[in-house]
């Protein structure tokens, strides 16, 4: 979360007058994050989050995202629930940006991931997948395997400036991963979060109190979401895989939804693909973002060691799972 678009007090109060959420008593911008402008609203009716969607979010996707969040909330998942105005609409315009209000979730995200976080995260991810069965509309994964060759091409001219030989290593990785990628109907599919990093999961008293930031969510292989979490939650800062965290994550997930044998066999290639996806999008931002642009760059090399680990893995035993 972050603030890129300022909102005047008068414009905000006029906007809130369309809702039945009480009178505004205070508001503040949220500094964290990289994609949208976010504000905490305090009203006489409670606390809420106001999001203004910036240019990196396709407005055409917003009804799907908001619909998914509403469905997941209806099915008991602790996630932001879109608040509708008196006219029944959740999506409006404020300060020239698409905007929506959602419910406020208590808790804080873990700055240092421990084994104790991983089982609750796995269980919450499985609960998300189960709840998502109630949402029939599909959204293609715009950053799935079909997008990776184009990202490589867009980074080719400058990618080796980040690390010599990086582009050749990415070429070799794609040559392994893409032919081995499971077909659409090979594994269970459904609605996935696709970005469940620690800063998108809130904890309170040791339990998951909320999952946020659904703006990369899409319809894809459920096990790919697990693979993303293995990358995001189960590696040390130096890129070393922590098998204890991995075991906890998988055990937590399977306490809600057991994996199929085919999903288990596919996890190494899915994890390699997930590492490739985040390496490539970080690399693209690193080499293509001009100074002063509205993007916070993250080091792509954080994912290179992860990718190398996954490429060397042959089965779940390679992960100590």
Swiss-Prot record:
It is an enzyme of class 2 (transferase). It comes from the Bacteria. InterPro entries: Aminoglycoside_PTrfase, Homoserine_kinase_II, Kinase-like_dom_sf, Pseudomonas-type_ThrB. Pathway: Amino-acid biosynthesis; L-threonine biosynthesis; L-threonine from L-aspartate: step 4/5. The keyword Electron transport does not apply. Pfam families: APH. Keywords: Amino-acid biosynthesis, ATP-binding, Kinase, Nucleotide-binding, Threonine biosynthesis, Transferase. Its EC number is 2.7.1.39. Belongs to the pseudomonas-type ThrB family. HAMAP family: Homoser_kinase_2 (MF_00301). This is Homoserine kinase. It comes from Gluconacetobacter diazotrophicus (strain ATCC 49037 / DSM 5601 / CCUG 37298 / CIP 103539 / LMG 7603 / PAl5).
């Amino acid at each position: 979360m972050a603030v890129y678009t300022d909102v005047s007090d008068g414009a905000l109060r006029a906007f809130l007058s369309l809702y039945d959420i009480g009178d505004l008593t205070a508001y503040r911008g949220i500094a964290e994050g990289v994609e949208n402008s976010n504000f905490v609203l305090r009203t006489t009716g409670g606390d809420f989050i106001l999001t203004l969607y910036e240019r990196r979010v396709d407005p055409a996707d917003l009804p799907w995202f908001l619909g998914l969040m509403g469905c997941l909330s209806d099915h008991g998942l602790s996630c932001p629930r879109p608040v509708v105005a008196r006219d029944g609409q959740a999506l409006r315009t404020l300060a020239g940006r698409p905007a929506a209000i959602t419910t406020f979730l208590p808790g804080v995200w873990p700055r240092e991931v421990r084994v104790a976080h991983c089982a609750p995260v796995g269980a919450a991810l499985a609960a998300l997948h189960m709840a998502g069965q109630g949402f029939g509309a599909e959204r293609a994964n715009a950053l799935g395997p079909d997008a990776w060759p184009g990202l490589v091409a867009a980074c080719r001219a400058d990618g080796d400036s980040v690390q010599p030989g990086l582009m050749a290593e990415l070429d070799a990785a794609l040559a392994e991963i893409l032919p081995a990628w499971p077909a659409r109907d090979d594994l269970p599919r459904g609605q996935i979060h696709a970005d469940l990093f620690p800063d998108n999961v809130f904890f309170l008293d040791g339990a998951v109190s909320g999952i946020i930031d659904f703006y990369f969510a899409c319809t894809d292989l459920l096990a790919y979401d697990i693979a993303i979490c293995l990358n995001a939650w189960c590696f040390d800062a130096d890129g070393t895989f922590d098998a204890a965290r991995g075991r906890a994550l998988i055990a937590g997930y399977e306490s809600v939804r057991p994996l199929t044998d085919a999903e288990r066999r596919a996890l190494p290639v899915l994890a390699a693909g997930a590492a490739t996806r985040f390496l490539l999008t970080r690399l693209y931002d690193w080499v293509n973002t001009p100074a002063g642009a509205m993007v916070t760059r993250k080091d792509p090399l954080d994912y290179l060691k992860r990718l190398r680990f996954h490429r060397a893995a042959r089965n779940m035993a390679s992960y100590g799972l």
